[in-house]
């Protein structure tokens, strides 16, 4: 009976840890995310986050874990990204026809369409992303942290005359953040922490706009079926923003060898 209870408890513990592991996975939309873990995290597939002993990336990822760092520690990491993106597929205009170039015959006035066949070429990019972390214990209960991170970004460049030009041509989003954080050790098993981030974002998103196709959707023009692929204009939206954010976390050490963490950004 005792053996069966041990099996049940072991199964229950694994189920809880499995649930925590799933819940800890980051949720993100389209784009690219730069890992903000420490350099050693690459070697362990970022498992365990910033809960390992004397991990300075806790200054950003989970400030509560700084409370268990027993000495000043710093780290600088330079990440290099080489992303290949290629498109294979079809693209259609507003009328459901394959994306094409439309030219009006000067003699007859009738439109002549030539399908676009370009796949956009190499849409990927290369980038360097530096990160740095510093944690300084203040006393037995408090620790202070600083970090410089590149939380996310995006970069795609497609040929201007490719078949998907009405959806994307050139996109660039760059972010950089400076953070400060503080942790408090409640006892030898539990700690909490929080911090703030000053983040600067720059970039642009561009795509072509089919002016005649847009006009064809206007009720003021009686939904006149203008030919697609004729009136084109490049639209570019730029962003340049500096804003404040915050993050918080907690860490619990149920045993001397295990640590569970929860963080919010």
Language-model segment annotations:
Residues 67, 136-137, 184-185, 248, ...:
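Residue-level signature of outer-membrane beta-barrel architecture
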Residues 71, 139-141, 187-189, 255-257:
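Outer-membrane beta-barrel channels and translocator barrels
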Residues 74-78, 146, 182, 194, ...:
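Membrane-embedded beta-strand positions of outer-membrane beta-barrel proteins
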Residues 24-144, 148-149:
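N-terminal, post-signal peptide beta-strand-biased segments of exported outer-membrane/organellar beta-barrel
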Residues 81-85, 149-155, 199-203, 212, ...:
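Structural signature of outer-membrane beta-barrel domains
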Residues 92-116, 201-238:
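Solvent-exposed loop segments that connect transmembrane elements
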Residues 57, 125-130, 174-178, 242-246:
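Residues that define the transmembrane beta-barrel architecture of outer-membrane proteins
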